[in-house]
């Protein structure tokens, strides 16, 4: 589904199939929303233009507009609850610039571990994503804030930052910052205060 304005995002199906219906339905909270029902195909087929290779590309594209377009067309959004489109965050208003890019690894909700696991298992991809966003924002420093109760994630992310920085200057200016375990430090304003002081 295509976005309905600048502050909206493409929605892609997680399965191969055919759209059966687009209709208002209640979600789990009882709110009426537009739902897209898909009849799942027997065979998985990827859309044209989707890179399905398992290789991790570490060389950053030169063209910032290309990076933003790929982020937008692939429907990349934040996972903080509002699913805010990432391409919007990477386009500050004219005359404004980012002082620092902060990646939120401060998963402070009790019993949640998805951020922790992805930092352990996909640390290189996260650092590559940070470098892409840092480049689009004009090369500002990037900080990955992780609470001190996640030693495996801290180690994995630090190793990824160090090894990628040694391989290319594209990855300089990215650091892991260990944060005190504090609720609700994962909130936007609390995280900015913790990282920036």
Where would I find each of the regions flagged by the language model?
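Short hydrophobic beta/alpha edge segments that flank linear recognition/processing sites
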Residues: 1-8, 34-38
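Conserved short loop/turn motifs at secondary-structure junctions
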Residues: 3, 56, 140-150
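Generic structural motif
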Residues: 4-6, 11-21
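Acidic low-complexity segments
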Residues: 21, 26-79, 84, 95, ...
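Short acidic, glycine/serine/threonine-rich loops at helix termini
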Residues: 31, 49-52, 82, 88-90, ...
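Gly-rich Lys/Arg/Thr-decorated short loops/hinges at beta-loop-alpha junctions or inter-strand turns
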Residues: 46, 78, 101-115
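Histidine-anchored nucleotide/phosphate-binding helix
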Residues: 120-136
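Hydrophobic alpha-helical positions that pack around
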Residues: 143-197
